[in-house]
């Protein structure tokens, strides 16, 4: 708003995540990469990602698995030769936690604000290959090791076991940022500032 010369106070808090006991564990890693969600995602990048890993698109609840935007983008899969992408229907919370603890996530975002998948990956220490948008950097930090700038770089990072372990450990250091306690304290601070 500053660049528009609008003098309006704005408060900021990070989206919190309720704790999750199931964390990514490299010893259980199944060499699979998953795509989660559909809003402002570039599905084509996921389908074009060159990897030996099993690729899985989590379709989510019925209401968005049948959304025209989602369906149009899922049809992009057929344009790519030898695409080993599998589709999973909506998962229970238990099964979602399980797949997150044994996989790496890949997203190519057109834009984002407070992205649930980013927060869920921090909470579970699940490495997420993601393009470094400003709003993503607010959550993952500028030194996050699993940012990519091209699909070739993403594919290369996906094959680096040490980097995957390092990324999971790095995400542990970001968990305080999304804690419920921090959210409540920050929200209280923001409300005090505007009252």
What is the role of each PLM region?
Residues 21, 27-93:
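Conserved catalytic-core segment of nucleotide-activated headgroup transferases in glycan assembly
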Residues 98-113, 126:
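Acidic donor-binding loop of glycosyltransferase active sites
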Residues 90-103, 121:
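Short alpha-helical donor nucleotide-sugar binding micro-motif in glycosyltransferases
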Residues 97, 115-123, 134-137:
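Short alpha-helical segment that forms part of, or immediately flanks, the ligand-binding pocket
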């Amino acid at each position: 708003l500053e660049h528009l010369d609008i003098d309006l106070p704005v408060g900021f808090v990070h989206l919190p995540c309720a704790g999750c006991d199931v964390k990514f564990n490299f010893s259980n890693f199944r060499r699979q990469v998953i795509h989660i969600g559909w809003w402002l995602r570039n599905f084509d990048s996921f389908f074009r990602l060159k990897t030996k890993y099993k690729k899985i698109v989590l379709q989510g609840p019925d209401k968005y698995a049948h959304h025209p935007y989602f369906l149009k983008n899922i049809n992009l899969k057929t344009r790519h030769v030898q695409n080993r992408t599998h589709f999973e229907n909506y998962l229970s919370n238990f099964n979602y936690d399980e797949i997150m603890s044994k996989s790496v996530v890949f997203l190519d975002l057109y834009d984002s604000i407070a992205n649930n998948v980013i927060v869920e990956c921090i909470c579970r220490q699940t490495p997420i290959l993601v393009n470094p948008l400003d709003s993503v950097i607010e959550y993952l930090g500028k030194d996050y090791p699993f940012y990519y700038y091209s699909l070739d770089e993403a594919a290369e990072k996906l094959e680096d076991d040490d980097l995957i372990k390092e990324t999971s450990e790095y995400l542990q250091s970001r968990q305080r940022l999304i804690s419920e306690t921090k959210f409540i304290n920050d929200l209280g601070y923001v409300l005090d500032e505007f009252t």
